[in-house]
Amino acid sequence: MDEFLAKETAARSPSVFHCRLIPPRPDFAFTLTEEERALMNAHVDYLRGLLREGRMMIAGPVADPAGPWGLLILQVGTEADARAVTEGDPVARSGRGFRYEILPMMSTIM
């Protein structure tokens, strides 16, 4: 299956990636400290920059009953490019337990 996905997504450039930002705790969105709020403001500023650059299509929190998480849809060249974008996010660099899961979209309707 991985080989199939690699071939399918390699054929399209730029490619679209579904990036899921998993916060450090399930209730994070409801229990932010002032320091975490400032970090989230830096995160939002970073995402706005990606939107201006044309690398981000949409982003926002998802109301998952198990706990909110962040959705980021990127349109970049490769999965390595998507990883570089997510690794550049202030929340990912913060060392506070945020992590991204990145999956290529097999197709998109835009």
Predicted region positions:
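Conserved, structured core segments of small domains
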Residues: 1-110
